Amino acid sequence: MSEKYLIFGATGSVGSNLAEQLKNSGYDPHLVARNENEVKTISDKLDCTYTVADVLEDGFIEKIKTDINDIKGIAYCIGSIDLKPLRMISEQDLNKCMKLNLYSAVEAIKGYQESLK
């Protein structure tokens, strides 16, 4: 069995290209994305597994772990920035940005830390 790698943000250009490179190198990517139609299309093309999950929702790691437990690595290819003047940025904007770009990545690593040792 080839080594499994979780690819978060697998429907974006970085995530989908990384998944394709891993597959072509003999690894087994497991795709994670929030849009089922898009992730299924990529999964079918690469012949790999996937989970539909939104990293902004509580319990997203538990949802993914129902599909895959043992992994070799994680690629967190999710990111966004809210470009607007500082005077217009609210605390809610900052919290959402931190949750998407940092906290969810930390949760993913924590959720799979035993497998990653």
Predicted feature locations:
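Conserved Rossmann-fold cofactor-binding substructure of NAD(P)-dependent oxidoreductases
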Residues: L56-D70
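Conserved NAD(P)H cofactor-binding loop of Rossmann-fold oxidoreductase domains
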Residues: C77-L83
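Substrate-binding pocket helix/loop in short-chain dehydrogenase/reductase
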Residues: P85-L86, D93-M98
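N-terminal Rossmann NAD(P)H-binding glycine-rich loop of SDR-like oxidoreductase domains
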Residues: F8-E20
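Conserved glycine-rich Rossmann-like NAD(P)H-binding loop of the short-chain dehydrogenase/reductase
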Residues: S25-V39
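A short, exposed helix-loop element centered on a Lys and neighboring polar residues
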Residues: I109-K110
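Rossmann-fold cofactor-recognition segment
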Residues: S43-G59
